[in-house]
A protein has these predicted regions:
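Short, compositionally biased
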Residues: 1-105, 124, 150, 273-281
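Functional-site microenvironments in short loops/helix caps that host divalent-cation chemistry
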Residues: 25, 31, 36, 74, ...
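General helical structural elements
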Residues: 244, 259, 278-281
Length: 281
């Protein structure tokens, strides 16, 4: 840490925030976006970013339960009485009555596991949790900077390289076979996986590819210098990281620069989040 003022601020923050749960990401310059990706990822451009703290892990069911118990919070899925689930047996997305963060597939299905990422939480729910913890959701810039190890891995598809398998080992939780017609959990998981099951990146951050899409703070808009108009299904709050449903034959989501979006009130069974804490000098 080169700047004395920044060092003082960081020391004070570390006293407040459990650094066993958050990772300090030193700011700097990096190339954001990708000229080799989909149109929505273009153009690639240099950005200067300030230092911040980011959750080492995705927010878990257990974490979210603690928040609900302390704040008496009710999620939007619980208010609406349903949430969005993909039915792979008939290849269709459905609104399932009773689906929520405790029962991601619906009340008639298995309840959520305490050490898995919480899902069926809307952007509004995720932000409410972050604010309760005196944090916020990451911007897309922060997310990509952290996922790419401060921009050091931007010449790769993923933070570990360009292949999903390394030495016959799956590096993240994705759909591992031909989607949607064949069983896709050669990595051991059909749906979510426990936090920290797969290897972290070199900064010590887990699940920055696959498992669940992650809500970001900003709206999903064309980048500066990109004049395209996004179709309706790409308008909403930005999401990053891909999920257990992503497969390279149809989904780009687990690449470092990949983007998606969903309306902020929507709750889905393959979308979760993590928090950041901004550091101001």
């Amino acid at each position: 840490i080169e700047n004395i003022n920044e060092k003082d601020v960081i020391s004070e923050i570390i006293e407040i925030y459990d650094t066993n749960k958050m990772i300090f990401v030193k700011g700097g310059k990096f190339n954001f976006g990708s000229d080799n990706g989909l149109d929505r990822e273009k153009p690639e451009r240099e950005i200067i970013i300030q230092s911040f703290l980011i959750d080492k892990n995705l927010v878990t069911v257990e974490d979210f339960r603690g928040f609900v118990n302390e704040s008496s919070y009710t999620t939007e899925a619980e208010i609406f009485g349903n949430a969005i689930v993909y039915n792979d047996s008939i290849d269709i997305w459905q609104l399932v009555d009773g689906a929520n963060w405790e029962f991601p597939l619906g009340k008639s299905k298995k309840n959520s596991s305490h050490n898995h990422p919480v899902t069926q939480v809307s952007w509004n729910d995720a932000l409410a949790y972050c604010k309760f913890c005196d944090k916020t959701l990451p911007s897309e810039v922060q997310w990509e900077y952290a996922a790419s190890e401060r921009g050091q891995k931007k010449n790769q598809l993923f933070y570990w390289g360009n292949d999903l398998l390394v030495n016959d080992k799956y590096m993240c939780n994705t759909w591992n076979s031909g989607y949607p017609n064949t069983i896709g959990f050669k990595d051991g998981f059909k749906y979510t996986s426990p936090i920290g099951h797969f290897e972290a990146n070199s900064l010590g951050i887990f699940d920055m590819a696959g498992n669940v899409w992650e809500w970001c703070y900003n709206w999903h808009l064309p980048y500066e210098g990109n004049s395209q108009i996004f179709p309706t299904d790409l308008k909403g709050k930005a999401q990053r990281g891909g999920s257990f449903l992503c497969n390279s034959n149809y989904c780009h989501g687990f690449r470092l620069s990949a983007r998606s979006a969903t309306s902020p009130e929507s709750s889905l069974f393959h979308v979760g989040f993590r928090c950041v804490k901004n550091i101001t000098n």
